[in-house]
């Protein structure tokens, strides 16, 4: 029997396991998962202490702990040493944010897509490739790692991002950034491991971690930048194994890590032997390029640079720099996931990067981002918005009468797609009410301006919210 009486005692969750089928830890985990997914337990709800739950249910503490761990590995719970266990902020949100093409009337400002204008240049490269004698070889299995030309192209790309790579033997190729991150997590982490990151981060990391049973831990921040003290605390108390960061225009907060912050992260990584995954997805878009974290901690950092935001999203290719300590494991994971990346895409990317057209493509991208941000600022400069003129998305902090989720729903009802802060949240604490707005995804400047006007109208006419929802 329970030691204490719970008849008049408040608990945020009082599961009933009277009719549960053994093993009890699995049955309890299933009840907890169902209560979260059904909405009975809301995002941010703090669960009762595990000892309290064990007493209430009259079962062993270890049984409760095993149940909590199972649900945590599915990404539905988050915990912090000394703070307790919470229902994850994104537990009731779809974190898959790829473009949906099922409604042409919706103005796309959710998914981050570069313009299609410069794709015409890419088409000319493709046409030339398939007309060449012997082009059949690009449709065969091929290992780009074996090509010195491809490796040297990757080195050139890295050097353009201020990562000084002299040894082209540490280069790997993946079918896009998400593919590269998946390979790194699958090869260097195991179920139950913890990886630290920002309080709001790219949802793709969360979906991979959830699939692999890896717990994502939010690190203490100051002005959207991870603090050295917070990182040390997470290493000592949360026992994180690694760290995932987007150092330039972090998705979704738009923050770029300061040089001091990069040095601090590198210092802590070396001290605690952390695996740092540096996602350089936006680095090439910056006019003033910073020194990558990898430059300060090459032995601890895996640097992933995708071509999707700079050249084209359909060019599914990322260059990866890894120290020899991780190289073979990541290489094996990439082989198991892909066998190989497309030889056609690797050849095409190499030709573009080694041509004058690369600068032309990047210039087109940058100009469109700048032009769209001018339109954005024209209408929304009176609101709290993060993001500079070269950033391909903005982070709009909402007035208190909106949650991110409610604003996303309202905007969609008026024909504009944006993404709420709940989609990006890590952990179970109170959220900032915000939405991410992609500035380059609308089909034209006119369509983008129309979408921004709709957003401004929603912000100014909050008396219609209850009716809309």
List each model region and its residues.
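N-terminal basic, amphipathic alpha-helical segments
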Residues: 1-130, 139, 150, 335-342, ...
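Short beta-strand "wing" residues that participate in macromolecule-binding interfaces
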Residues: 78-79, 165-166, 418
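Short loop segments at secondary-structure junctions
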Residues: 90-91, 299, 307, 322-326, ...
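Conserved core of the PLP fold type I
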Residues: 138-272, 277, 283-300, 456, ...
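A short, glycine/Asx- and small/polar-enriched loop/turn
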Residues: 178, 429-434
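Conserved core segment of the aminotransferase class I/II
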Residues: 302-367, 464
């Amino acid at each position: 029997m329970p030691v204490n009486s719970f008849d008049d005692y408040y608990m945020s969750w009082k599961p009933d396991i009277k009719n549960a089928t053994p093993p009890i830890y699995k049955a309890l985990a299933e009840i907890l998962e169902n209560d979260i997914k059904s909405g009975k337990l809301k995002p941010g709800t703090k669960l009762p202490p595990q000892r309290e739950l064990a007493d209430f249910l009259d079962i062993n503490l270890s049984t409760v702990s095993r149940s909590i761990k199972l649900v945590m590995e599915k990404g539905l719970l988050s915990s912090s040493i000394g703070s307790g266990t919470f229902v994850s902020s994104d537990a009731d949100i779809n974190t898959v944010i790829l473009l949906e093409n099922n409604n042409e009337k919706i103005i796309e400002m959710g998914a981050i897509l570069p313009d299609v204008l410069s794709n015409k240049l890419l088409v000319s490269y493709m046409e030339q490739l398939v007309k060449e004698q012997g082009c059949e070889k690009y449709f065969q299995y091929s290992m780009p790692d074996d090509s010195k030309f491809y490796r040297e192209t990757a080195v050139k790309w890295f050097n353009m991002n201020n990562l000084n790579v002299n040894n082209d033997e540490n280069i790997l190729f993946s079918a896009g950034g998400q593919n590269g991150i998946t390979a790194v997590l699958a090869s260097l982490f195991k179920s139950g491991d913890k990886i630290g990151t920002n309080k709001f981060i790219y949802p793709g990391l969360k979906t991979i971690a959830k699939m692999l049973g890896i717990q994502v831990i939010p690190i203490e921040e100051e002005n959207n930048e991870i603090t050295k003290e917070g990182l040390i605390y997470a290493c000592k108390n949360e026992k994180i194994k690694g760290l995932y960061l987007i150092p330039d225009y972090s998705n979704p907060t738009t923050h770029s890590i300061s040089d001091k912050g990069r040095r601090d992260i590198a210092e802590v990584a070396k001290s605690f032997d952390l695996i740092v995954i540096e996602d350089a997805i936006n680095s090439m878009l910056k006019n003033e390029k910073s020194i990558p974290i990898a430059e300060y901690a090459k032995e601890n950092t895996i640097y992933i640079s995708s071509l999707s935001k700079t050249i084209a999203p359909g060019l599914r290719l990322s260059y990866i720099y890894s120290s020899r300590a991780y190289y073979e494991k990541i290489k094996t994971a990439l082989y198991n996931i892909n066998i190989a990346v497309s030889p056609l895409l690797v050849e095409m990317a190499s030709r573009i990067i080694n041509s004058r057209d690369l600068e032309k493509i990047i210039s087109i991208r940058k100009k469109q981002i700048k032009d769209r941000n001018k339109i954005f600022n024209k209408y929304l400069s009176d609101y709290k918005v993060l993001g500079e003129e070269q950033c391909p998305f903005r982070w709009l902090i909402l007035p208190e009468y909106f949650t991110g989720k409610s604003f996303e729903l309202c905007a969609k009802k008026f024909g504009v797609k944006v993404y709420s802060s709940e989609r990006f949240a890590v952990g179970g604490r109170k959220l900032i009410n915000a939405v991410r707005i992609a500035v380059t995804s609308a089909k034209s400047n006119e369509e983008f301006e129309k979408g921004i006007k709709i957003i401004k109208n929603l912000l100014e006419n909050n008396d219609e919210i209850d009716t809309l929802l």
